[in-house]
Structure formats: C-alpha cells, structure tokens
Amino acid sequence: MYKLIIRPILFCFDPEKVHYFTFSLIRTIAKIPGFTSIFKSLYEVNDKRLEREVFGLKFKNPVGLAAGFDKDAKLYKELSNFGFGFIEIGTLTPKGQEGNPKKRLFRLQEDSAIINRMGFNNGGVLEAVERLKKNNGVLIGGNIGKNKLTPNENATSDYEICFDALYDYVDYFVVNVSSPNTPNLRELQEKEPLTQLLNTLQNKNQNKQKQTRDGAQSSGAKPILLKIAPDLTNEQLLDIIDIVKTTKIAGIIATNTTISREGLQSINRIEMGGLSGKPLTNRSTEVIRFLSQKSNKAFPIIGVGGIHCVQDAIEKLEAGASLIQLYTGFIYEGPALVKAINKEILKKSL
C-alpha cells in the first residue's frame, strides 16, 4: 500500500514539508488507543534469534533507523514501533541552529536517492535531553556534531558539551565529522585532529565511568562510534583503522552521505549537498568490507547507505557489518522493509 498509494501522494509535495507532516501524522495516529499494538503487529518480528550483543549493548534486532530522521528525539518511541531494533537521534549540536537556507532537501526519484544540505538543523542538545528523559526501553544512539559558527580549532568543546549533556540518556554515541553540509567539518576526519577529538571524548568517558562507580550506580563507559564518509581513500580508511585501535573507540558507522554524483540521472543531481540512497549502496558496502578485512574484524561496524531491499542489507552484513541502519530506503520503500530484512536475516541464519 505504501509504494502504490501513500508514496506517490507524498512525493507530490516538498520533501521537507512532507517530513514534518509525516512526523505529525505518526504522532497523532500513535495516540489513538490500540494503534501502537497494530503497528507492532504489522512491522515487528519478535524472535530471540534476531538479538545481537554489540559493543556491550543488547539489540532486539540488528536493523536500526539512522540519524537525521528524528534529529531532536521527538518521535523515537513511535518510530520504534515500526520494528527497528534501535533509533539514532541527531545530529545534535550544543546550541540550536536553523541549518542551511531552504530549499535544502531534494528527491532524485530516477535514482532512488536524496540530496540534502540541511546543515545540522536542530533545537539544541538540551531540548533533546528533556525528551529523552521520558524514554522507557528504546535503545538510543546519540549522534553529535559541532555548531556551524564554531571554528574547527574549538570543535572539541562542542562535542564535549553534547557528550556531557546526553551521557545519561543515550546508549551509545556517534561522533559525526563526515557530513558535507557544515563548512570544513570533514577536515576533522584527518588523522591528527580526529585522534585528538576522540581521545578527549574517551578520557571524559573513562572519567565518567569512575565517577559512576564511586556513586550509587555503576553503568560503565558508553560506546563511542565514529561515522565516516564514503569518499575516503583506501589510505584514509587505513588511517581510520589505526585511529580506532589507538583511541579504543567502540566501532565505526559506514557510511555517511557522499559528495559524488557519478551515474546520476535526475535533474536534481546538480544540487549541492550529501547524496544518500541507492547510488551509495555499493560504495558503502565496499567500505564496510575493506574495514572489516583490513582490521581483521577488530571492531564492530554499523552498515548504512543505500539499503533499499533485503539483498542490500544481507550484503552489508556479509561484508562485515554487525548492525545496519536505514534512512532513504525507509522513505522510498516504506516501513515494510524493516520486517522483510529481519525475516530474511532469520531465514539465512545470519
């Protein structure tokens, strides 16, 4: 029904307006008595064999929702009813910011893709924290970044602010230095500044662990992951492996959006921003395979980028991903994709 009726209607309108309309619609429907149970019965696959333990966390299934869909933690409870094993919120910054000027989100229907240049639009980390205080059982990842006006030499401070604010309310962290839509952000992917940033967060992580142990509770350090671009060279990817081992972060999310426009058909290919969707499928899988093989599977990888069908998901898992995430594929294919992937994982005993 989604692809035949709902998607054609939604795709007649501006993508960003549709996004917020969909948010309001899901929130409204979820308030109707009984609808939560209906959603779960339609989209959830409850099977112990789907459970995964990765970087010390227990996931009810390996299919998550990628960051960017629920930036401000406004809908994570409702979205979890679509069968996701975990929800990643963000990217969040210390201060709320409008992001880049509109129009900044574009469909490329001929390519089953999206280009966005949103620019970390969000209400600020503290607003999200207030919503996360009401969380009851949804496994949450916190994707953090820097404000647009913060110069790179002060970027670490922004990440620290977000880390401190979210620490008690998310299950894992994602350091986002790979978005192409914040000026100069990708420069932080270079080995020296990235190592410094991650070491700072890890030191803070360990200190928080000690403080917790001295107090009434003991929850341990939170897993910190790094989200990388698909546009890195093999040499840069080898640097990433070294950085993970040196800083002892928990793992990698591969990959973010790409600045490549190779092979695109849509007229919207001329738009600036990060490309996501089907054109990214093969490259993100290549990056996952490279990292897994060259590191000897030394750390977990969350695979994301161009998962539009069951086979796309299986290929990423077979390439070395421990978990996977959807975003653009969820928009193009609808919520039934989550259930289909989980059922195929069971079928293949992955």
Curated annotation (Swiss-Prot):
Binding positions for substrate per the UniProt entry: K71, N116, R117, M118, G119, F120, N176, N181, N256, T257
Pathway: Pyrimidine metabolism; UMP biosynthesis via de novo pathway; orotate from (S)-dihydroorotate (quinone route): step 1/1
Domain of life: Bacteria
Molecular-function annotations in GO: dihydroorotate dehydrogenase (quinone) activity
Alphabetized InterPro entries for the sequence: Aldolase_TIM, DHO_dehydrogenase, Dihydroorotate_DH_1_2, Dihydroorotate_DH_2, Dihydroorotate_DH_cat
Keyword Cell membrane attributed: yes
Gene Ontology CC: cytoplasm; plasma membrane
Biological processes annotated in GO: 'de novo' pyrimidine nucleobase biosynthetic process; 'de novo' UMP biosynthetic process
UniProt-annotated catalytic positions: S179 (nucleophile)
Residue positions binding FMN: A67, G68, F69, D70, K71, T91, N143, N176, K227, T255, G277, G306, Y327, T328
The reaction(s) this protein catalyses: (S)-dihydroorotate + a quinone = orotate + a quinol
EC number of the protein: 1.3.5.2
Keywords: Cell membrane, Flavoprotein, FMN, Membrane, Oxidoreductase, Pyrimidine biosynthesis
Function (record text): Catalyzes the conversion of dihydroorotate to orotate with quinone as electron acceptor.
Name this protein carries in UniProt: Dihydroorotate dehydrogenase (quinone)
Species the sequence originates in: Flavobacterium psychrophilum (strain ATCC 49511 / DSM 21280 / CIP 103535 / JIP02/86)
